[in-house]
Amino acid sequence: MTTREQWIAFITIVRKEIRRFLRIWMQTLLPPAITMSLYFIIFGALIGSRIGEMGGFTYMEFVVPGLIMMSVITNAYSNVVSSFFGAKFQRFVEEILVSPMSNNTVLWGYVLGGVARGLLVGLIVTLLSLFFTRLHIQHIGVTVGIVLMTSIMFSLAGFINAVYANNFDDVSIVPVFVLTPLTYLGGVFYSIDLLPEFWADVSRLNPMLYIVNAFRYGVLGVSDVNVGTAFLMVGVFTLLAYGYCMYLLNTGKRLRQ
Amino acid sequence: MSKALEIRGLRKVYDNGFEALKGIDLCVEEGDFFALLGPNGAGKSTTIGIICSLVKKTAGSVSVFGHSIDSELALAKKEIGIVPQEFNFSNFESVWDIVVNQAGYYGLTRELAEQRAETYLRQLDLWEKRNTASRMLSGGMKRRLMIARALVHEPRLLILDEPTAGVDIELRRSMWAFLKEINQRGTTIILTTHYLEEAESLCRNIAIIDSGEIAENTAMKTLLKQLHRETFVLDTKEPLPDTISIAGFETHKTDEQMLEVALEKGGSLNAVFAALSEQGVEVTSMRNKANRLEELFVSLLAKS
Ligand SMILES: Nc1ncnc2c1ncn2[C@@H]1O[C@H](COP(=O)(O)OP(=O)(O)OP(=O)(O)O)[C@@H](O)[C@H]1O
Ligand SMILES: [Mg+2]
């Protein structure tokens, strides 16, 4: 296929992916909006006022960046894993597998779908947060950069999950048992300075800590960790995930019999 | 003429160790209408799966219009349109979206995709249903949707895996007419079916596959010539005498007023009727016991 034909195929997948999550907005866009609004009300407004300051900011200001990032991560991941697994489950992934488009086209089509949902939900959550606090973005480049890279990384990870998933339980295992706990423990709700030395060190092994802090640095200008390290780490994980996705597609593992 | 499909020494061992294809050779000329027949589990869908790269081959080679699926897979894929045995489209998408998106996967511009989608949905009588979610179509409509989807990029080789399974007679005949027409316009067609009448009326060449091996691969006419025994069923006006027999013919009284007569190649039906008249039997109607290809099929499979 010519580059132009690959481009058309790519746009076809992206369009289809975006239309899919918009069509089922009650399952894709509404839940994070409700959950995050509840977080804002409970942690920010009700409990937050008693907690006082965290890292030099009101508690509300402190938690908002982490909650936005958490929404981006889970939605980018969930979109790709459920869409691609659905295609596998109903077998219409075969429409793509028999077509002449390249494996890169297929992969980036799905990844961009995940990124689109991650960013859209991130935007919705950001807008909702404005009812509770003000946001003055300190470093726009860092903010946008980390959101984009993170949503790409988790979309790729969602794709790997979809290839291996055998049933709908396998689709929700990672978001529920891995992503959410790691994000909660990754400094969304507290600064790791508050933790005893040992637990602070353990927290530094959690990749989510770097992502959440890099984003918080972009928005508030403060971070518990080095932001350069965060970008490097997300970059390395993204490359690894990309390499693994291409390995799966090129060998046809679990996709072609 | 060039070859639409050339298969050499194709073997498939599935992950569980089952050998579904034991080294088959198959050749389909451009413009042909080719039947791939065989009993359940013979390896037809496996062969088709390998051609369109949904199944990974264990050994052997496949090329489509000269493009090897090992070295020029994308070019080979462009030439193929596939109608699989099982439904494989999204239940939630509309007929229109399914066909238009498929065109997009082959790199057709949106404009061309919509134009083609309209052409084929109209030809396959699905135009009225274009905005319907695919899960709400009837079984026959779903088959036709898969045909429209397979044709939207105008492949030179169309492969249909049991396209008329569960399709009523009227619709089956209109599908036959449609397939004949696109074959006449130049599309090479390979078809699998369990309705042998379908293969006989549509296909010029035929391969019979059994337990992963090619049992027969020849022209339909040549094959039908091999048929050396045909069974006829006669209905009679009065109940048949118990002693009924026709010298030189194998007969079988299946009912009071029904007689089966096996006619060997070169045998004369006149002799049958003469013998029956002599015994005072009046025949009111006569038909073939089975489709001719069916008899051949059964005897071939019994041999192998
Ligand atoms: N994924 C698989 N793993 C293991 N064995 C398989 C797999 N798919 C098919 N088979 C086996 O391979 C053999 C050939 O199957 P195939 O589907 O090619 O038959 P077929 O000729 O299309 O039959 P039918 O007329 O019933 O559609 C069967 O014995 C089947 O059980
Ligand atoms: Mg089959």
Predicted regions and their residues:
Chain B
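Conserved ABC ATPase "signature" region
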Residues: 100, 104, 111-129
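Conserved ABC ATPase signature
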Residues: 133-137
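Conserved catalytic motifs of ABC-family nucleotide-binding domains
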Residues: 154
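Conserved ABC transporter NBD signature motif
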Residues: 60-71, 75-76
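Catalytic Walker B motif of ABC-type/P-loop ATPase nucleotide-binding domains
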Residues: 158-161
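ABC transporter nucleotide-binding domain
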Residues: 176-264
